[in-house]
Amino acid sequence: MTLWQAFILSLIQGITEFLPISSSGHLVITRELLHWQDAGVAFDAFTGLGTLTAVLFYYRKDVCSILYHWFRQFRHCDAPPAPEAKLGNQLIVATLPALLIGFMVKDHIDALTHRPLLIASTTMIFAIFLAAADFWGRKKLSLPETNYRQAFYYGLAQTLALVPGVSRSGITLTAGLAMHFSRESAARFSFLQSIPISAAAGGYGLWKLATNPSDFSWQLIALSYVTATLAAYVCIALFIRFLNTVGMMPHVIYRLLLGAYLFFVFM
């Protein structure tokens, strides 16, 4: 992989990771269209850690507060958990389904990553679901009103993102809006929910890299990490800023057009 290819792919990863348009789908399609080889374990691990860094930094106050109160609840077992501790518990509940199912079916999912027509189909189908949830959802619930059943539903939704083209942020936003959460609350839970699963995926990638060393350039890795981090942070900030005024329809329209284009190219 050249530095130019690493820059393009990590930029795509950063831009698409937190937008409801599927980062994995865009990476696969870019490689297919440009006939680039798979970037490899090192690239995947460090770009994933880059987007993780971005969301951690953007929500650093929330993350610190959640961690503080989550550990504190064990010293005060006789008192009800603080809202931040409860949110931490809910994020664990929302992470477990994708973590467990992903571990069991990873090899099968990897086999789907080179099927452009599948990506085209999921891109379009789940765009329609996102549009329906945004249109009919009542958008009245706030994040503190989340219960454990709803957190579990967020987790089940996240498991669907194992399929290329679905979009992790897209399907969890769809779930939140369908459960009548406000756009801001659904986005905040979705982005916070990405932290544990991204950390697990990054850790797994680093473990694979450590146990199966391969040739890679630290210059390439550094470029990929920094590019993904900066691009992801800017996208999170812009997405949250314009969420209520822009809504989901631009993303829905983009996904429908992208899916149609992929069918045209790969049919």
Curated annotation (Swiss-Prot):
Membrane topology of the entry: Multi-pass membrane protein
InterPro entries according to UniProt: UppP
Top-level taxon in the UniProt lineage: Bacteria
GO molecular function, one term: undecaprenyl-diphosphatase activity
GO terms under biological process: cell wall organization; peptidoglycan biosynthetic process; regulation of cell shape; response to antibiotic
Keyword Cell wall biogenesis/degradation: yes
Annotated keywords: Antibiotic resistance, Cell inner membrane, Cell membrane, Cell shape, Cell wall biogenesis/degradation, Hydrolase, Membrane, Peptidoglycan synthesis, Transmembrane, Transmembrane helix
Gene Ontology CC terms: plasma membrane
Subcellular location: Cell inner membrane
Pfam family for this entry, one: BacA
Principal localisation: membrane
The EC number(s) this enzyme carries: 3.6.1.27
Substrates-to-products reaction catalysed: di-trans,octa-cis-undecaprenyl diphosphate + H2O = di-trans,octa-cis-undecaprenyl phosphate + phosphate + H(+)
Transmembrane segments: 1-21, 39-59, 85-105, 117-137, 189-209, 220-240, 246-266
Record-linked PANTHER family: UNDECAPRENYL-DIPHOSPHATASE (PTHR30622:SF4)
Note: Bacitracin is thought to be involved in the inhibition of peptidoglycan synthesis by sequestering undecaprenyl diphosphate, thereby reducing the pool of lipid carrier available.
Function: Catalyzes the dephosphorylation of undecaprenyl diphosphate (UPP). Confers resistance to bacitracin.
Family: Belongs to the UppP family.
Protein name in UniProt: Undecaprenyl-diphosphatase
Species annotation: Dichelobacter nodosus (strain VCS1703A)
Gene: uppP
